[in-house]
UniProtKB/Swiss-Prot annotation:
InterPro entries: BRCC36_C, JAMM/MPN+_dom, JAMM_MPN+_peptidase_M67A, MPN, MPN_BRCC36. It is an enzyme of class 3 (hydrolase). Zn(2+) binds at H122, H124, D135. The gene is BRCC3. Its cofactor is Zn(2+). This is Lys-63-specific deubiquitinase BRCC36. It comes from Bos taurus (Bovine). Metalloprotease that specifically cleaves 'Lys-63'-linked polyubiquitin chains. Does not have activity toward 'Lys-48'-linked polyubiquitin chains. Component of the BRCA1-A complex, a complex that specifically recognizes 'Lys-63'-linked ubiquitinated histones H2A and H2AX at DNA lesions sites, leading to target the BRCA1-BARD1 heterodimer to sites of DNA damage at double-strand breaks (DSBs). In the BRCA1-A complex, it specifically removes 'Lys-63'-linked ubiquitin on histones H2A and H2AX, antagonizing the RNF8-dependent ubiquitination at double-strand breaks (DSBs).
């Protein structure tokens, strides 16, 4: 029985530069949820090892050892462009999934590693970090295509009532099939409980799902990867494109009068200025500071190189 019920993923290792991009994206807007896809690889090499072919009680021990190595490594993320901006809902279009798969293939060729889309992330502004019933349902549908697919949630713009300071919470989860309601001895569960029972549209009523929390670890890096740096720079462009799409969609309506169009143009300009102040400005300052640090580090390395060369020449 222990071999049949196997947890798809035991842990997630998120690179610190990818975590930085996710955090910047989540903090870019306070009114709507944002979303992106995670690119990485699933470490399950031992599962296909021919030496794990035991049976009976011994198989259970070996299976448990194999399961412990199923770790998702997230190396970079792809920021998605929202076609429909809502406060409590965000979705992935098939076109975006296809584009993300193409990008993962490009990264696989570039790095020589089996990169693919391994998960998705989205933000929860002003609400709990735990996934809603819609999140659990969406995650279950993704896992029907890939059992190793994981979901990340970043809860931001949360204020601690005691210290009056803001904080950001994050979690990683998957969906698993829950027990039938007839087998559960307990009564109704809390809406945000980890034992929440969810029905999937189009499935039988007894096929319910609940979330399971996946341990997530941030892997520190001294430098920032090129792919993550490109994603961070791409964020202001994507936000600007979203505002342009929304403005053009409203501006194309024929029944609007001149005053309304002028008002809409003013709102569009205001939103762009807000983005420049909240996203583009701090990002530019951070890049300039990072460049200055890198230049200083290069000077230190050059000085160290000269000192080592002098020591080497003195030994000769």
């Amino acid at each position: 029985m222990a071999v049949q019920v196997v947890q798809a993923v035991q842990a997630v290792h998120l690179e610190s530069d990818a975590f930085l991009v996710c955090l910047n994206h989540a903090l870019s807007t306070e009114k709507e949820e944002v979303m992106g896809l995670c690119i990485g690889e699933l470490n399950d090499d031992l599962r296909n090892d021919p030496k794990f072919t035991y049976t009976g009680t011994e198989m259970r021990t070996v299976a448990e050892k194999v399961d412990t190595v199923r770790i998702v490594h997230i190396h970079s993320v792809i920021i998605l462009r929202r076609s429909d901006k809502r406060k409590d809902r965000v979705e992935i279009s098939p076109e975006q999934l296809s584009a993300a798969s193409t990008e993962a293939e490009r990264l696989a060729e570039l790095t020589g590693r089996p990169m693919r889309v391994v998960g998705w992330y989205h933000s929860h502004p002003h609400i709990t970090v735990w996934p809603s019933h819609v999140d659990v349902r969406t995650q279950a549908m993704y896992q029907m295509m890939d059992q190793g697919f994981v979901g990340l949630i970043f809860s931001c713009f949360i204020e601690d009532k005691n210290t009056k300071t803001g904080r950001v919470l994050y979690t990683c989860f998957q969906s698993i099939q829950a027990q039938k309601s007839s087998e559960s001895p307990r009564g109704p569960r809390d809406f945000w409980s980890s034992s929440q029972h969810i029905s999937i549209e189009g499935q039988k009523e007894e096929e319910r799902y609940e979330r399971i929390e996946i341990p997530i670890h941030i892997v520190p890096h001294v430098t920032i990867g090129k792919v993550c740096l490109e994603s961070a720079v791409e964020l202001p462009k994507i936000l600007c494109q979203e505002e342009q799409d929304a403005y053009r969609r409203i501006h194309s309506l024929t029944h609007l009068d001149s005053v309304t169009k002028i008002h809409n143009g003013s709102v569009f300009t205001k939103n762009l200025c807000s983005q420049m102040s909240a996203v583009s400005g701090p990002l530019l300052q951070w890049l300039e500071d990072r460049l200055e640090q890198n230049q200083q580090h290069v000077q230190e390395l050059q000085q160290e190189k000269e000192e080592l060369l002098q020591e080497l020449s003195s030994l000769e």
